[in-house]
C-alpha cells in the first residue's frame, strides 16, 4: 500500500513539474473603476505604480485590463518568484498607494486625503501553467 502511495506521489510531482511554469507567480488585483474614470486610473498607474514596480527585484511586467460589464480594472503583475514579491514590505506598498490615491484625487478635484477612489475588490495569487506537450 505504501509503495503504491509513494509511486502515485512521485508521478504527481513529476507531472506538476512539467505543468507548472517555474517559481514564477502572478499577483492578481481587481479594483472598482467607473467607466468615466478609466483614463484617470491608467494615468495614475503609469505615474506611480509602474516606475516603482520597475525598480523591484523580480518584477517581470504586468497586464492591465478593464471589465466594462462590472466596471472593474484588473492587474496581473508577474513576479519571478513568490519570495521576491512577498519580500516587499507593506510600508513600501502603502507609500506608493498614497501617491497613487493623491494623483487620482487631484485629477478628480477631491481632497488629497480622501479615501481611495478605486477600492480593492479582489486580491489573489495565480500560478502560471504550461500546456502539456
Positions of predicted regions on the chain:
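Acidic/histidine-enriched, glycine/proline-rich intrinsically disordered or flexible terminal extensions
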Residues: 122-133
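N-terminal targeting signals for Sec/Tat export/insertion, comprising classic cleavable signal peptides
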Residues: 25-55, 82-83
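An amphipathic, aromatic/His-enriched active-site/gating alpha helix that lines ligand/cofactor pockets
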Residues: 47-60, 78-123
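Positively charged n-region of N-terminal signal peptides that target proteins for export
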Residues: 1-5
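Bacterial N-terminal signal peptides
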Residues: 6-16
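Short, well-ordered beta-strand segments in beta-rich or mixed alpha/beta enzyme
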Residues: 24-32, 61-92
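Boundary at the C-terminal end of the N-terminal hydrophobic targeting segment
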Residues: 19-21
Amino acid at each position: 500500500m505504501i509503495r503504491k502511495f509513494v509511486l502515485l506521489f512521485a508521478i504527481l510531482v513529476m507531472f506538476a513539474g512539467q505543468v507548472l511554469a517555474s517559481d514564477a507567480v502572478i499577483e492578481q488585483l481587481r479594483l472598482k473603476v467607473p467607466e468615466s474614470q478609466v483614463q484617470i486610473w491608467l494615468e495614475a498607474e503609469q505615474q506611480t505604480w509602474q516606475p516603482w514596480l520597475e525598480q523591484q527585484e523580480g518584477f517581470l511586467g504586468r497586464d492591465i485590463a478593464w471589465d466594462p460589464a462590472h466596471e472593474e480594472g484588473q492587474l496581473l503583475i508577474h513576479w519571478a518568484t513568490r519570495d521576491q514579491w512577498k519580500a516587499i514590505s507593506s510600508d513600501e506598498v502603502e507609500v506608493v498607494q498614497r501617491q497613487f490615491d493623491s494623483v487620482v484625487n487631484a485629477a478628480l478635484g477631491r481632497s488629497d486625503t480622501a479615501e481611495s477612489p478605486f477600492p480593492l475588490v479582489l486580491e489573489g495569487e495565480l500560478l502560471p501553467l504550461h500546456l502539456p506537450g
